[in-house]
Amino acid sequence: MIQLDDVCFAYDDRPILSHLTETIEPGQAVLLSGPNGSGKSTLLRLLNGLIFPQQGTYSFDGTIITAGKMRDHAYSKWFHQRVGYVWQNPDSQLFCSSVREELAFGPVQMGLKPADIRQRVDDALELLGLTRLASRPPYTLSGGEKKRTAIASILTMNPQVWTMDEPESYLDADGLAWLEDFLPSLKAAGK
């Protein structure tokens, strides 16, 4: 469960999140909508432990998330195994030398067995139509291929919570159709 209680955040004294209070239950889907600069990406960064409330609290599974907590390697690892973040711009997320390595990065950090990692990566490559691109460096891919790689890299981690910043950006019609089928499957799986 995610709980936000009186959360405030500002950039240079410009309020972005103002006294936000919300509870998100397991399996609940939430869509953030608003104009540019209204705080959607800021909230997603906060939910992923990349920034922290300047006022109020953010709790995940009953534990208040703080900068100190996230500096604790064991806690940070536990948290990031449970919360996945697909960035708006996939170039912000992709850094490995091949698509296959990109998809394996999270599971390797989680300490999974090599056979399990291979299976997760192969399944994600197949599901997202990336098998033929597995050995290519992400920087050589089209925007839509990069976005699918970014989504696949989170899929291989199997997080409890998915957060996506403009998941439809960079996707073509086929990618959008796939995403429209995929998102309900996450909800059905209780994520």
Tell what function each PLM region has:
Residues N48:
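Helix-to-loop junction immediately C-terminal to a conserved catalytic motif
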